[in-house]
Amino acid sequence: MENVDTSRRGFLKSAVAASGAIMAAAAANAGIPASAVKSYEEEFDVVIIGSGFAGMACALKAGRAGLRVLMLEKMSVVGGNSAICGGNVACPCNPVQKAQGIKDSKELFIEDCLRDGLGINHTNLLATIADRCNDTIKMVVDCGCEFVPNHMLFEGGHSVPRSYEIKAGSGSGYIRPMHAELKKIKNVVIRTRAKFDDFIVSDDKSEV
C-alpha cells in the first residue's frame, strides 16, 4: 500500500482537495454567514456527517492519525442504511480468488460494472475500487469483521465469482466492529440524534 501523509496538515490538505468541489457547490447555494455566528463552543479537525461505511472509515483514518474527530448521526443508532444493506463486497484479484484459481482482472471488473451500469459509471472511480479493495478488506478484517471463509459469491452482473460474503448476513457485520473500534479512539467523538443543519461559510461564500 502506498505511503500516506497522515500528519495533521497533510491529512487536512488531502481531505480538502478531495472534497473541495462538493463543498463549494453546496456552499454556493446554502450556508450560514460566519459573521452571524457569535461564538464556537467546540473545535474539531474533522467533522463527519453520517455514520455509515464511508463515515466510519473516514473517522478511523483521521482518528488514528491523531486528529480530533466529530461524527454526527441524526438517528438514535449508528450505521444508517449501511447497517441494513446486504453487506457483500465485490473485490477483483483478491487472495481467495487466487487460491481457488479464479481468473479475474481490474479491466474485467470495470467492464462488468460499465455493462451493468449502462455505461454511465465513472471509470476512474471504478479503477480506484479495483486498486484499493484489498486494502479495504484488510482494514475491516483488522477491525473484527468476519467473512465466510474461503468463499466467493458469484453475484449478478459479474463475470466471475469475486464477492466476499459477510458472516452476519447484513452490513451490521461491518458497522458493529467498526463502531467498537472507533469507541477505543479517545480523540473520536460520536454523537447520535445530532442532525446537521448547515455549513458556516465566510460572508463571500469563498470558504467553508
Regions found by a protein language model. Give the residues of each.
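N-terminal secretory signal peptides and thylakoid transit peptides that target proteins
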Residues: 2-19
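Beta1/beta-strand and adjacent pyrophosphate-binding region of the FAD-binding site
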Residues: 40-52
